[in-house]
UniProtKB/Swiss-Prot annotation:
Name used for this protein in its record: S-adenosylmethionine synthase
Residue numbers binding Mg(2+): 17
Known cofactor(s): Mg(2+); K(+)
GO biological process: one-carbon metabolic process; S-adenosylmethionine biosynthetic process
Organism, scientific name: Salinispora arenicola (strain CNS-205)
Pathway: Amino-acid biosynthesis; S-adenosyl-L-methionine biosynthesis; S-adenosyl-L-methionine from L-methionine: step 1/1
Annotated positions binding ATP: 15, 174-176, 244-245, 253, 259-260, 276, 280
Annotated disulfide bonds: none
Organismal lineage: Bacteria, Bacillati, Actinomycetota, Actinomycetes, Micromonosporales
Record SUPFAM superfamilies: S-adenosylmethionine synthetase
GO cellular component: cytoplasm
Keyword entries, A-Z: ATP-binding, Cytoplasm, Magnesium, Metal-binding, Nucleotide-binding, One-carbon metabolism, Potassium, Transferase
Length: 399
């Protein structure tokens, strides 16, 4: 059988785009904690010595945005000019307006309610925008994620951990990982290449210090004993291939909310509708429906209805009911895909208000989603990672 290579990347919490995501979600959480019905769309731009926050907010809450910005940056580890950024002394500008009344009327008073087609409370909330959202799951890992992105995230988290714990004390917060996996058909069989790029202090030897430390303290703990049938012997290791990575963080590159949407999802292994997540409250289906589609796809795979599942949903702004649902199982289904799709429509309510209710999305839980992936981490607050509907799906699909 033909063998092919697939690659996914991850970034650490200190990557400039991820700093921006964490600031935006930190502001969102602060507002939701005081007013769960807050409407929030906050974008962050971070560059050398400066942070700019802009967007639209309608809320009864108050958030000290400059304080949130500084606390987020300091918590990540940018606390000195030697690291290229200092959260205590950077400039912060804020430009926040209110949500458009034209959008609000469609969200608060959905098409179905306005036209008299329904009086259901769940039909009262329309989608906050048009668009299509995808979810994906596969049986490659215990968390039902593709192997390349799952391993890339593990390495990024470990890279940050050894920096924070002082195991590799000369590391700085900015970093990236990339993993290439060899596939035989649809099955991952071999780790081919691992790339790690990490910001570091000055005068650190790449060959005699950084590369051995990355191999021993970052990669080895994650790949040794990984199991899952993956051959992890003799993979190629690349560490800081430019030869030096002293200038990093916002000094090296400007960061912007929503610029790591593939890192946030499935590492390019599945399709993406294009909408970013961070800084958006759950009335925005870009976020809430993408979470719901992960929930759907994961339950399809957990139910044994398919080994791989991609689910797409689409909405019209101001309408509660989706305009379409599409389920793809790539020939791995155990029952006809039409039955799976029908079971999904019976078991899951994909109206925005129902998604928010079922996944408990009005809680201030979003800061923890903003780095290391929104999917595949089975944390208590990540309700979309639950497989609580698998038995119902299996029963309705007649499996």
């Amino acid at each position: 059988m033909t063998r092919r290579l697939f690659t996914s990347e991850s970034v650490t919490e200190g990557h400039p785009d991820k700093i921006a995501d964490q600031i935006s979600d930190g502001i969102l959480d602060a507002l939701l904690a005081e007013d769960p019905r807050s409407r929030v769309a906050v974008e962050t731009l971070i560059t050398t010595g400066q942070v700019h926050v802009a967007g639209e907010v309608t809320t009864g809450a108050y958030a000290d945005i400059p304080a949130i910005v500084r606390r987020t940056i300091l918590d990540i580890g940018y606390d000195s000019s030697r690291k290229g950024f200092d959260g205590a002394s950077c400039g912060v500008s804020v430009s926040i307006g209110s949500q458009s009344a034209d959008i609000a009327q469609g969200v608060d008073n959905a098409f179905e309610l306005r036209t008299g087609a329904s009086e259901s409370a769940l039909d009262a909330q329309g989608a906050g925008d048009q668009g299509m959202m995808f979810g994906f799951a596969c049986s490659e890992t215990p968390e039902l994620m593709p192997m390349p992105i799952a391993l890339a995230h593990r390495l990024s988290r470990r890279l940050a951990q050894v920096r924070r714990e002082g195991v590799v004390p000369y590391l700085r917060p900015d970093g990236k990982t990339q993993v290439t996996v060899e596939y035989e058909g649809l099955r991952p069989v071999r780790l081919n290449t691992v790339l790690v790029s990490s910001q570091h202090a000055a005068d650190v030897s790449l060959d005699s210090l950084l590369t051995p430390d990355i191999r021993d303290h970052v990669i080895a703990p994650e790949v040794e004993g990984l199991g899952l049938g993956l051959d992890v012997e003799d993979y190629r290791l690349l560490v800081n291939p430019t030869g030096r990575f002293e200038v990093g963080g916002p000094m090296g590159d400007a960061g912007l909310t929503g610029r790591k949407i593939i890192v946030d999802t499935y590492g390019g292994y599945a399709r993406h509708g294009g909408g970013a997540f961070s800084g958006k409250d759950p009335s925005k289906v870009d976020r809430s429906a993408a979470y719901a589609m992960r929930w759907v796809a994961k339950n399809v795979v957990a139910a044994g209805l398919a080994e791989r599942c991609e689910a797409q949903v689409a909405y019209a702004i101001g309408k509660a009911h989706p305009v379409s649902l599409f389920v793809e199982t790539f020939g791995t289904e155990t029952v006809p895909v039409e039955r799976i799709e029908k079971a999904v429509t019976e078991v899951f309510d994909l109206r925005p208000a129902a998604i928010i209710r079922d996944l408990q999305l009005l809680r201030p839980i979003y800061s923890q989603t903003a780095a290391y992936g929104h999917f595949g981490r089975e944390l208590p607050d990540f309700t979309w990672e639950s497989t609580d509907r698998a038995a119902d799906l299996k029963s309705v699909a007649g499996a």
